[in-house]
Regions:
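Canonical tetratricopeptide repeat
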Residues: 42, 76, 110-111
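Conserved structural position within tetratricopeptide repeats
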Residues: 28-31, 61-65, 98-99
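Alpha-helical segment of the N-proximal tetratricopeptide repeat
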Residues: 2-32
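Register position in tetratricopeptide repeats
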Residues: 15-16, 49, 83-84, 100
């Protein structure tokens, strides 16, 4: 399989709400292509939705580093920090996102079962 086909497969897993499965497929792609923002974003989102918050934080921070003008990445990082009960730190990133014209995100429904973590 090509990298593109692997990415497409991971996207199918993500769309099917198998976020942990998508993350497993995306992690090696991100390691091989560290500057690819699309891969990094989908990986961070997969980590976030599968409640792998430490990994999501790292991935969103990397995304912010890769694209410092991406207000959505700042908002996503703020959401991740809030889920980790780091509200003061999240406020800084939320303010950056709002300064870039990004409205605060709506609450995200996160469903996680033991099967997702297998």
């Amino acid at each position: 399989m090509t990298t593109y086909e692997d990415f497409q497969r991971a996207t199918l897993f993500f769309d099917a709400k198998d976020y942990a499965g998508a993350a497993r497929l995306l992690a090696p792609i991100a390691a091989e292509n560290p500057g690819n923002r699309a891969v990094r974003e989908l990986l961070a989102r997969a980590y976030f939705h599968s409640a792998q918050l430490g990994r999501a934080e790292d991935a969103f921070r990397r995304l912010v580093d890769l694209d410092p003008c991406n207000g959505w990445a700042y908002e996503a990082l703020a959401r991740t920090l809030e889920r980790r009960s780091r509200h003061g730190e999240a406020r800084t990133y939320r303010n950056m996102a709002q300064a870039m014209g990004v409205d605060p995100a709506d609450k995200v429904d996160v469903s996680l079962t033991a099967a997702n973590l297998a």
